[in-house]
């Protein structure tokens, strides 16, 4: 028995009709499964469409039309269509009727189906999606059926359709490594830079699979090289460089690849050229780009400044996750063949920037005993030879004793040349007398003697500018066991600490424990239960599954803060929640300058493999604040909104700290200090509010390195400031952090502690 009874509606015909239809269908299924085309046609021609329902499936769930297609019988197919066969059905594996003729190259069947499709209204066979998310175009590309591909495209098949992985026809054609198919498809693609779920474009695939002709075709049609995939933050050229694909690498360079792009480890293509010793590509890049730093003044070299460097320029000061510039890498594995490259790069390098082991480029030049090769370049560089690496060694320690006097001569010349760059801009009188136009007041010989004395006896190899603003990193009391948890009470205590320390700063901690109705409803819709034992106050901006929720009474509280005229700054925590985990950011709002900065503790981008869609978050925040502030001031307020990529380095504080986990992890350390890094940064941001944020961030990182501080120790030690205040508040209600974490606080407890926090006006130092 072939018939599935559930497909019948017994009310539509009497028992005799049902019996005869069953017999006819069984006979037809027997004939078609036996490939008896003539007998099938003879039998069905004796029947009228009313005598059979050819849309009934057999006992295995198969439709008759699929047997006609598989046996490549256009005659039977046409007959079944004439008898009312449905074409919008799928086989037991979820494939559409277009699948088998395309797979097996049954061109006549393809033509029959496409021709019939053009005559009907409803679901189009051309673009029908199967149960796996594939469309006929995908079948044609998968099985390299160019005839089907041409026919489908000529009938306006949607080449821009994306499956569940966001893969479109162009992606598939490139993955099949077939340029003829790519040429057919590319004419119909609206967005050549469409990205898959993993963030890859067709150009990524072409470079990854070393497809030169396809890469060139894509570039000629306008493919964008400046798009990253989401797994490794790779740009297309990264695949080519790492695989030492010289031809495609050169092609991408010729089409303007940006040599300063970084992946998630902070490496650029120049880093990878050195790491894998792909020096032919390195040489080609060096010869096709101008080298420059972020300032035309050779004495001012900025590491990770956010000042724009044109794409046709090499920035030699880009650092990776290990704190290494490309010159660091070359010097750690020094070869004489690097000399010509080093001579080009050194004039534009910050020779005093320390990597994660504390070594500067100058340390490595000294260690390799090649400083004399670059003596003429070092003469015009800022040279701090007294920076100590993690082993406590200075640059001078690495110079062989017999050469130290000669080396100091180079340092003296550098010092002298640096003085002459600026008139009367120095801290000491004799330095001003030795600078620029003032040199007539004192002999050059005398100046060199004074400088040598400063270097040898005072251990100073760089003059200090007058009125220089210096940043001091406070390395707090050593904490071996931190109880900071990153929980809401820690966040509240941290932001309260900041507003106590900086009276001109305000946060949105108010005496109201309510949760906004939209947040309550959203929590219910996604099955999140509010923990009333830990609900102190909703003062965070929440970014939950890429949906934003502002704090309770947000606009009203903002208005009160602004109209009070007591505050210059407002600080906000941002709580980020994804299915893969939680994260924290912060906002710094300068009310006088009308500038908002979003701080991401990991740097300019989201943490690796934690894409919370920062661009959308920034777009929404910028728009919301402009609307709210314009409403408060009753006029259009033009807020300057700085995204992390506008001022933060690729490798930020927490990313650097994470590199120390294997060598510096204590019991009690949380999985991440993102909340604490946000509080720590806002502390320094408020302390140095007049600083450019890019310069502040750069100097903070540099100061931590120069002082040989551990990033993890810095943040762990800082935690005590917050946990002490938190424990003080908890002690006021006779509770401790364990009570809080174990949900032992009552609703009255949380109300009491909120009032204590709100009423705490005492300042801290």
From Swiss-Prot:
Keywords: ANK repeat, Repeat. Signal peptide: none annotated. SUPFAM superfamilies: Ankyrin repeat. PROSITE patterns: ANK_REP_REGION, ANK_REPEAT. Pfam families: Ank_2. The keyword Repeat applies. ANK repeats lie at residues 60-89, 93-122, 132-161, 165-194, 198-227, 232-261, 265-295, 322-353, 357-395. This is Putative ankyrin repeat protein L371. The keyword Transferase does not apply.
